[in-house]
A protein has these predicted regions:
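C-terminal lobe and pocket-closing loops
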Residues: 219-282
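An extracytoplasmic/periplasmic, membrane-proximal ligand-sensing/linker region
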Residues: 34-37, 46, 169-185, 189-206, ...
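A bilobed periplasmic-binding-protein/Venus flytrap-type ligand-binding module shared by bacterial periplasmic
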Residues: 120-132, 258-271, 294-295
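A conserved helix-loop-strand patch within extracytoplasmic ligand-binding domains
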Residues: 108-162
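Pocket-flanking alpha-helical
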Residues: 51, 68-107, 198, 218-223
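Short, well-ordered beta-strand elements
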Residues: 31-46, 63-69, 159-163, 279
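Short helix-initiation/N-cap motifs at beta->coil->alpha
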Residues: 44-45, 63-78, 187-198
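Ligand-binding pocket segment of bilobal, Venus flytrap-like solute-binding proteins
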Residues: 85-89, 161-239
């Protein structure tokens, strides 16, 4: 998971129940149902920008909208299946593949299509660290004790330190370290904001850091660095220990790459048809998503401000989403 982004202002996103774009709707835009459309908030910036944009659009179309904090992976088989969540806008192939398959199998959710950007999440290091570990980006360089020590901290030495995402993002980095025999200790960040604050501080000081970076996000555009090149992911890598270079353990490969998917409760289409059209047609390209996240994480704007500005600047686009059938 999983920004370009994730949230220095998650609390601000949750406060976004006061939605951007709350202008009074025209009478002709009266909704099909007054029941609230519940849009999921997760713990990174881009998804909450998207949630506020979608929520603001639907608010302008006359809908009752709630932004609902939710757990990223488990929401696929809990909130979305029960209707406690109506729609969620970012499930990444890189981390949520198993959860999406389980959600699909329930018959209670609908995959609305891809958001637009291609998803990538992997171990990443600033380019200046390559001098201390010249075999990079090949993952086998990390097995060299001298390379590991270059990434070590007092708490992990002689092991290198790998800063992973919050535990709720999963990603299987603990398993990856074990199956590939890497002399690294995985430390999970408490929040997305803390993770990227640590990155900024390390780069300012030219300190060692190896961490989970995902794209789309502003960080790989702002900072020069490289992703580690692990053995290529296949589905069997995560399910069959005999696959890959370690015949006794799974997860001996990199993370999968792929799409970012939108999901809805199966009843959205019949209860709120126009809102369903908006959600199904909703797209955002990678560059734009990175810029929006950077406005929050780097420029200090609130998610609500960023969402409202996008809604105001793109009215013809989102009205087209509302009028186009799915």
């Amino acid at each position: 998971m999983m920004n370009q982004m994730r949230v220095s202002g998650l609390a601000a996103a949750f406060a976004g129940a006061i939605l951007a774009g709350g202008a009074a709707p025209a009478a002709a835009e009266a909704p099909e149902s007054q029941d609230p459309i519940k849009i999921a908030l997760f713990d990174w910036t881009s998804v909450n920008v998207n949630a506020n944009i979608l929520g603001g659009i639907l608010k302008r179309l006359g809908y009752n909208v709630e932004l609902v904090p939710a757990d990223y992976i488990s929401s696929l088989t809990t909130g979305l299946t029960t209707g406690d969540i109506t729609v969620a806008l970012e499930y990444w192939d890189t981390t949520a593949g198993e959860g999406m398959a389980a959600s699909d199998a329930t018959g209670q959710t609908e995959r609305l299509g891809a958001l637009g950007p291609k998803a990538k999440e992997e171990w990443w290091y600033p380019i200046y660290m390559k001098e201390k570990c010249p075999g990079l980006p090949n993952w086998e360089a990390l097995k060299d004790p001298k390379c590991a020590e270059a990434f070590a901290t007092p708490d992990t030495a002689p092991n290198g330190r790998y800063l992973g995402g919050p535990v709720t993002w999963e990603g299987f980095d603990d398993e990856r370290v074990q199956s590939l025999g890497l002399p690294f200790t995985v430390i999970h960040a408490g929040t997305d904001a803390a993770m990227f604050a640590e990155l900024a501080a390390a780069i300012d000081r030219k300190d060692a850091i190896m961490m989970w970076i995902y794209s789309p996000h502003w960080a790989p555009a702002k900072y020069e660095g490289e992703w580690v090149e692990f053995p290529e992911h296949t589905p069997e890598c995560y399910t069959d220990p005999k696959w890959g270079i370690n015949p006794d353990m799974a997860y001996d490969c990199g993370k999968p790459f792929g799409e970012i998917w939108k999901y809805a409760n199966v009843n959205m289409k019949t209860t709120w048809p126009v809102a369903y059209n908006v959600a199904k047609n909703y797209t955002m390209d990678a560059k734009e998503l990175g810029l929006l996240g950077g406005q929050v994480d780097l420029d200090g704007k609130t998610i609500e401000e960023v969402a409202e500005a996008w809604i105001n600047a793109n009215e013809s686009k989102w009205r087209g989403w509302a009028s186009s059938g799915s």
